[in-house]
Amino acid sequence: MKFNISNLKAVFAVAALGAASCTANYEDINRNPYEVTGEEMERDGYAMRSFMTTMQSWVVPTDRNQCQFTDVLLGGPYGGYITDANNGFNAGKFSTYDPQSNWSPVFYRVIYTNEMSNFSELCKVTEDENAIAVAKVVKVAGVHRVSDTYGPIPYTQVGTGANPVPLDSEKEVFKAMFADLDAAIEVLTRNRAGMISTDADRVYGGNLERWGRLANSLKLRLAMRIVYTDFTTEDGRTPQQLAEEAVASELGVIADNAGNAMYMGFGKDGNPFYVCFFSFKSGEGDHRIAADITSFMNGYADPRRASYFNEATFSGGGYVGLRNGIRIPDDERINRYSRYNVTASTSLMWMNASEVAFLRAEG
C-alpha cells in the first residue's frame, strides 16, 4: 500500500509540473501570431493615429450607409435640403415623421458611440497634449450634433466606470462641451506653431493653428444656438460672452475658405453623398434636392445654384427640387429632378467661413 501511495504522489507531482509548464506560456501559445499586440500598436504613434482618424471619419459619417441614415434620410428632409427619391422609401421614413423603429437610434449609435469610445481609447495611448486637444475638438464637432438631435446624452461621466452611464441634461452637456473647447483652445493657441502627425489628420494636415480656429468657430456656433436661453457656464459666462470670446480669441475664427474644416479621405466608394445621389439605385441615386431649398433660391435668382445643384432634365431645365413627404412616383419621372452637385472626390464639409460669417452677423 505504501508503494502504491508513493507512486500516486509521484504521478500527481509530474502532472502538477506539466500543468505549470503548460500555463507558463499560455498567453503566448494562444496569441494570434498574425495579429499586432497592444505594444506594437503604440509604436510610432500608430494607435493614436488610428483612433484620431476614426473619430474624424464619424463627425459626418464617411460610411455610405450610415451617412444615408444620419445626414440624408434624417438631416436632409428636416433641413429642407434633400428628399427621398426611391419609392422603396414610400413608408416609414423621417420625411413623413413615421420612421421605422430601427432608424431612429442610428444617429446616436453610430456617431456618439464611435466618437466617445475612440476618444477614451486615444487618451489611454498618448499623453501628447496637442493630440488630445485636437481630439477634444473632433469629439465636440461630432457629439454636439447628437445632443442637438436627441437632447440629453451621457457625456460627463463617460469613462468613469459608472454602469449604466447616466444621461446629462442638454445644459450640462453644453457646459462640458464649452469646457472641452476652452481647454483645447488654450493648448492650440499656446502651441499654434506646432503640428500633430499628418497621418493622424484628414482635415487640416496636422496644422494646430487651423484646429484652434475651428475650435473657436465651434464655440461660436454652440453659443449662438443657446443665446436666447438662461444658460451660463460653471464660472458664470453667458452665451453672448462665449461668442464674443471666440471671435476675439488670439487665433480667431474661420475667416476664409482656406480655413474651412473639410474632411478629405474616403474609401473606394468616395464621398458618401455622391454614393447616395449617383450610385444607389443602379446609378440613378436614392435622393434628389428638396423643393424647399430650390424654391427659395429660384425666387431670389440666387447665383449659387449652379454650385449647389445639377440642372433638372425636364424639357425646361432649370433647378427643380422634389417635394418632401409626397408619395414617390415612378423612376422615369423622379430621375429628372435636380441632384446635389457633388463628385466622388468632393471633400466633406464640417464647417466653413460662410457659416461663421452668418453667425457673427447674427451676434
Predicted regions and their residues:
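Sec-dependent bacterial lipoprotein signal peptides
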Residues: 1-20
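Intrinsic-disorder/low-complexity regions
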Residues: 3-6, 24-27, 179
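Terminal low-complexity, poorly structured segments
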Residues: 4, 13, 69-70, 238
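Membrane-proximal, proline-rich intrinsically disordered regions
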Residues: 22-80, 110-113, 125
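Structured, solvent-exposed acidic/aromatic patches
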Residues: 42-46, 82-363
